[in-house]
UniProtKB/Swiss-Prot annotation:
InterPro entries: Papain-like_cys_pep_sf, Peptidase_C12_UCH, Peptidase_C12_UCH_sf, Ubiquitinyl_hydrolase_UCH37, UCH_C. The lineage of its organism: Eukaryota, Metazoa, Ecdysozoa, Nematoda, Chromadorea. Interacts with proteasome 19S subunit rpn-13. The record marks 173 as: Important for enzyme activity. This is Ubiquitin carboxyl-terminal hydrolase ubh-4. GO terms for molecular function: cysteine-type deubiquitinase activity. It comes from Caenorhabditis elegans. Residues 6-220 form the UCH catalytic domain. Keywords: Hydrolase, Protease, Thiol protease, Ubl conjugation pathway. GO terms for biological process: negative regulation of proteasomal ubiquitin-dependent protein catabolic process; protein deubiquitination; regulation of chromosome organization; ubiquitin-dependent protein catabolic process. Belongs to the peptidase C12 family. The active site is at 83 (nucleophile), 158 (proton donor). Pfam families: Peptidase_C12, UCH_C. GO terms for cellular component: cytoplasm.
Length: 321
C-alpha cells in the first residue's frame, strides 16, 4: 500500500457519509448509524449494505470463504487513509436498484473499472481526482499535527462492508485479496438476520479488548420515500379520512429535514479551522493559571466516559447471549 499522499483521514459519521454520497452525485440513498441489529423498528428497509468500523489488529481474521465470482465488484485499498471512501464505493458498486442513481462520477469509474482486476480497480479509485476531491472535502483544518504519545493511532482503524449478492452475504475488505462469503440466506429471509451473528461476534470480540467500533447502514433516502408515501395518501384521501396519517408523514419529513440540516452544520464545523481560536484561548487560560487544571479534568472525564461506553457495550452483548 502506498503512502497516504493527499488523502485525509475522515470521521466515521453518518452525516459525513451521507454528504459524501451527495458529493459523488448519488441519488436515492443515505447512511444511518445503527446502535443495535435487534431493533427492527429502528432499521430502514431495504438495507443495501452495512459499513463496519473497528480497530484493526495484526492477526485478526474473519471466518469466511474467499470468492472470486465475477458478479461482485471489489477493489483493493491501495493507498492509506482512503479506507472510508473505499468501503463506501465498494458497497455502492454492488447496489442493484433502479431507484438508486450513482451519478456521473461513480458511473464513469464503474464503467472504466468493471473489467479490471481488484488491484487495478483500487489504483483507478485512488487516482481519481474527482473522488479524492469529495473525500478530502471532509478534512479537518489545522495548522499543525500533534503527536500524542501513548494514544491510539487513527491509522489502525479500518472499514469493511457487508453486502448481499444473490443469496449470499459478502464481506468486502480492501486489504484482503478477495471478498469473503460470510453468510447465506433464503430468498424469503432478511439478509440482516443471516449476517447478525457474524457482526455480533465481532462486536463482542472487540468490546472485550475495550476497542471502539461502530456500525452504519446504507439505506434508501428517507425523505424521498416519505414524500412518495405522502403523494399516495393525498391521492387516496378523497373523504379526508387520512388526515392523521398525512400529518404524521409531514412531521417525519420535517424531522428528516432537521437531521440533514444538523448534518450540514456539523460538516461545516469539521471543515472550519478552529486552531487560531484554540491557541488564543489556551494562551489566556495559561496566563490566568487555569490551563493545567482544565486539561487534567478533561482527561479524567474522557477516561470515565470511555470506560462507561465500554461497560454499556459489554452488558448489551452479554444480554444478547
Amino acid at each position: 500500500m502506498t503512502d497516504a499522499g493527499s488523502w485525509c483521514l475522515i470521521e466515521s459519521d453518518p452525516g459525513v457519509f451521507t454528504e459524501m454520497l451527495r458529493g459523488f452525485g448519488v441519488d436515492g440513498l443515505q447512511v444511518e448509524e445503527l446502535y443495535s441489529l435487534d431493533d427492527d423498528k429502528a432499521m430502514t428497509r431495504p438495507t443495501y449494505g452495512l459499513i463496519f468500523l473497528f480497530k484493526w489488529r495484526q492477526g485478526d481474521e474473519t471466518t469466511g470463504i474467499p470468492s472470486d465470482k465475477q458478479n461482485i465488484f471489489f477493489a483493493h485499498q491501495t493507498i492509506q487513509n482512503a479506507c472510508a471512501t473505499q468501503a463506501l464505493i465498494n458497497l455502492l458498486m454492488n447496489v442493484e436498484d433502479t431507484d438508486v442513481k450513482l451519478g456521473n462520477i461513480l458511473n464513469q469509474y464503474k464503467e472504466f473499472a468493471i473489467d479490471l482486476d481488484p488491484n487495478t480497480r483500487g489504483h483507478c479509485l485512488s487516482n481519481s481526482e474527482e473522488i479524492r476531491t469529495v473525500h478530502n472535502s471532509f478534512s479537518r483544518q489545522t495548522l499543525f499535527e500533534l503527536d500524542i504519545k501513548g494514544g491510539e493511532s487513527e491509522d489502525n482503524y479500518h472499514f469493511v462492508t457487508y453486502v448481499p449478492i444473490g443469496n449470499k452475504v459478502y464481506e468486502l475488505d480492501g486489504l484482503r485479496e478477495l471478498p469473503l462469503e460470510v453468510a447465506e440466506f433464503q430468498k424469503e429471509q432478511d439478509w440482516i438476520e443471516a449476517i447478525k451473528p457474524v457482526i455480533q461476534q465481532r462486536m463482542q470480540k472487540y468490546s472485550e479488548g475495550e476497542i471502539t467500533f461502530n456500525l452504519m447502514a446504507l439505506v434508501p433516502n428517507r425523505k424521498q420515500k416519505l414524500q412518495e408515501m405522502m403523494e399516495n395518501l393525498i391521492q387516496a384521501n378523497e373523504n379526508n379520512e387520512l388526515e392523521e396519517q398525512i400529518a404524521d408523514l409531514n412531521k417525519a419529513i420535517a424531522d428528516e429535514d432537521y437531521k440533514m440540516e444538523m448534518y450540514r452544520k456539523e460538516n461545516n464545523r469539521r471543515r472550519h479551522n478552529y486552531t487560531p481560536f484554540v491557541i488564543e484561548l489556551m494562551k489566556i487560560l495559561a496566563k490566568e493559571g487555569k490551563l493545567v487544571g482544565l486539561v487534567d479534568n478533561a482527561y479524567q472525564a474522557a477516561k470515565e466516559k470511555s470506560k462507561l461506553n465500554t461497560d454499556i457495550t459489554k452488558l448489551e452483548l452479554k444480554r444478547k447471549q
